[in-house]
Amino acid sequence: MLNIGYHESTANGLEGLGLEALEVGANTFAFFTRNPRGGKAKDIDEVDAQKLSKIMTENNFAPVVAHAPYTMNPCSADPGLREYAKQMMIDDFARLEYIPNSLYNFHPGSHTGQGSDVGIDLTSTMISEVFKNVKNTSTKLLIETMSGKGSEIGRTFEEVKQIIDLAEQKFGSSLKGRLGVCLDTCHIWDGGYDIVSNLDDVIEEFD
């Protein structure tokens, strides 16, 4: 079965996300966990969350994709911004327990002149620290592939694998089933992967 949906606005609440998906024949959807430009998240309305869960269960929804705000930069040169990113992610994990078995997608960050290796190291550190804080969660974390603009890390499949390998090393065990990848086709095309002419080869390389 094909799982298909699109990014929706949370303006009509959590139940509204499920209802909108049903209206267009979708069986999943994506949404921002908070304002994409950052800031404090709205308190979860538990009744609203229960209504969404009911819609998802009754209609056999696939896991939904929650997107972290763009302001999250786990490999910033500023320690304060790195801590802010970590605490924001921990908070989002707690909030997503109201929508069990979600996928939580985030941009691995920009190294801001420190170099890709430093950026990869810092982001992997944050991932391991987050999982040490959210031991009992049904949410799976996804590293989004990036286009490599500016000082973005995660442009190549090799860089994404480095982040995962280092995160597992620092966590002390495998994160299989808890950490994965969001393959953003727009980003990888912009980053140089020819998915138009050689999609099968690109997917094989990714695997």
Where are these regions (language model features)?
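N-terminal pre-domain/capping segments
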Residues: 1-68, 72, 76-94
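Charged catalytic cores and adjacent phosphate/nucleic-acid-binding surfaces used
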Residues: 5, 180, 190, 200-201
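Active-site beta-loop-alpha junctions enriched in small/polar residues
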Residues: 7-11, 34-36, 68-71, 109-111, ...
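Conserved strand-to-helix beginnings and helix N-cap segments that scaffold or border functional pockets
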Residues: 15-18, 42, 116-120, 153-157, ...
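Residues that form generic nucleotide/phosphate-binding pockets
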Residues: 55, 163, 205
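Active-site acidic/histidine proton-transfer and metal-coordination neighborhood
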Residues: 74-180, 190
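A short alpha/beta connector and helix-capping loop motif
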Residues: 192-207
